Amino acid sequence: MSISGTLSSYYVDSIISHESEDAPPAKFPSGQYANPRQPGHAEHLDFPSCSFQPKAPVFGASWAPLSPHASGSLPSVYHPYLQPQGAPAAESRYLRTWLEPAPRAEAAPGQGQAAVKAEPLLGAPGELLKQGTPEYSLETSAGREAVLSNQRAGYGDNKICEGSEDKERPDQTNPSANWLHARSSRKKRCPYTKYQTLELEKEFLFNMYLTRDRRHEVARLLNLSERQVKIWFQNRRMKMKKMNKEQGKE
């Protein structure tokens, strides 16, 4: 009971004391009670000031101070970002993302970040070429000789001209050049070999006009097409007529 009595008296005294202190300023002018309140302020100065321990900086020494040149060149709105000085080796392994493949070969000691990993080079479709690796051709000498022999086989001049090409091809990337230098549909003249010309002359002297069967046989023997044999005989007859006209005029 004594404890409860002391507590109740303490609360009552505190309420009464605060009301008694706050009441005079409300009833009377502030000038009369200005001086008595000053000792109260002096009493509060006796208490020791609160001292807080300084906290460690969040980022530490990793953030370097801004250089005056960078701050002067850029406006005040944009703050230049400076890369941290150096991250510990233990933290660097956690900076790697799971998408980045780990390098297979480690850099030599002393090179540091200057070491560059050799990237594969793209060659033909389905092939990867690395730097510093020699290229080997799968074609042997026997295979090359076989290809050359196949190219030399047959008559070199007996090829049928299937299309004409200009002597100077225009630039394929320039449409105006393609339009100005359009290729003509006329085919090139295919010269006959001496053997073919001799055999055709013999056949012409024997008969100026060939039947279809004979023309097919001559084309097969001379490795020509029936159309080539037919055109050659037509040109030969026109040439003979021209020669006869010139001889008649003389």
Swiss-Prot record:
InterPro entries in alphabetical order: Abd-B_homeobox_TF, HD, HD_metazoa, Homeobox_CS, Homeodomain-like_sf, Hox9_activation_N, HXA9/HXB9/HXC9
Primary localization class, coarse: nucleus
Region feature Disordered, mapped onto this chain: 21-48, 160-182
GO biological process: anterior/posterior pattern specification; cell chemotaxis; DNA-templated transcription; embryonic skeletal system development; mammary gland development; positive regulation of transcription by RNA polymerase II
Entry GO MF terms: DNA-binding transcription factor activity, RNA polymerase II-specific; sequence-specific double-stranded DNA binding
Compartment(s) of residence: Nucleus
Basic and acidic residues: bias regions: 160-171
Pfam families xref list: Homeodomain, Hox9_act
Matches recorded under SUPFAM superfamilies: Homeodomain-like
GO CC term, one of those recorded: nucleoplasm
DNA-binding region: 185-244
Keywords: Developmental protein, DNA-binding, Homeobox, Isopeptide bond, Nucleus, Phosphoprotein, Transcription, Transcription regulation, Ubl conjugation
Sequence position, cross-link Glycyl lysine isopeptide (Lys-Gly) (interchain with G-Cter in SUMO2): 117
Modified residues (Phosphothreonine): 133
Entry function: Sequence-specific transcription factor which is part of a developmental regulatory system that provides cells with specific positional identities on the anterior-posterior axis.
Family indicated by similarity: Belongs to the Abd-B homeobox family.
Protein name: Homeobox protein Hox-B9
Source species of the chain: Mus musculus (Mouse)
